[in-house]
A protein has these predicted regions:
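Catalytic or ion-translocation cores adjacent to nucleophile or general acid/base/metal-coordination motifs
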Residues: 1-9, 15-68, 73
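C-terminal accessory/tail domains of diverse enzymes
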Residues: 44-153
C-alpha cells in the first residue's frame, strides 16, 4: 500500500484558498530545538499525529522539517505497531502541508505516516480496516488528513 492517496515516487501538489479544519487546530505540546531559534514547533491537537513548524525563514523551516523527516524515517515503537523498516522496505514518511500567513510566515504541518501491513491488516495497519469499508475504503489522503471527509458515492 501507499501512504495517503498519492504515489510517493513523484511530486504531487494541490492548491487553493480553502481553510481546512487542521489549519485552525492549536498546538497541544510546544517543542523546542536550539538549532532552529527562528522556528516555533509543536504537536498539533489533531487526530493524525502532526508536527507544526512556523517561521519567517523558509530555509530554516525547511531545515527543521528535514531533520524531523530523517528522524521519523528511522523511528520505531513496537508498542504502537510503528516499525520503520521491514528489511530494506521503508514504512515511515510524512505528508507535508504548507501554507503562508502574513502574520506568522511559513506554516508547515508534517503529518506522520506509516504504511506497514500485517496479515490481519493487509491494506495497512493505519489505513481504513475492512469493518469500516462501508464508510471509507480508499487510503486516507491529504484532504482527509486536513479534516474533510470524502464519503463513498
Amino acid at each position: 500500500p501507499i501512504v495517503g492517496g498519492s504515489i510517493l515516487s513523484h511530486s504531487h501538489f494541490q492548491g487553493g484558498r480553502y481553510v481546512f479544519p487542521m489549519q485552525k487546530a492549536h498546538i497541544a505540546v510546544p517543542l523546542r530545538n536550539a538549532r532552529y531559534t527562528g522556528v516555533k514547533a509543536g504537536i498539533v491537537n489533531w487526530p493524525v499525529s502532526t508536527v507544526r513548524l512556523v517561521g519567517r525563514s523558509s530555509q530554516e523551516v525547511q531545515n527543521a522539517a528535514d531533520d524531523i523527516l530523517r528522524t521519523w524515517r528511522d523511528y520505531s515503537d513496537t508498542s504502537v505497531d510503528i516499525i520503520a523498516h521491514t528489511g530494506d522496505t521503508p514504512h515511515n514518511t510524512v505528508t507535508p502541508i504548507l501554507h503562508y500567513d502574513e502574520n506568522d510566515g511559513y506554516i508547515l504541518d508534517l503529518a506522520l505516516r506509516n504504511n506497514r501491513t500485517t496479515e490481519q491488516y493487509p491494506d495497512g495497519i493505519f489505513h481504513p480496516h475492512k469493518e469500516y469499508h462501508n464508510i471509507k475504503k480508499e487510503n486516507i489522503g491529504l484532504i482527509e488528513v486536513m479534516g474533510l471527509a470524502t464519503p463513498p458515492a
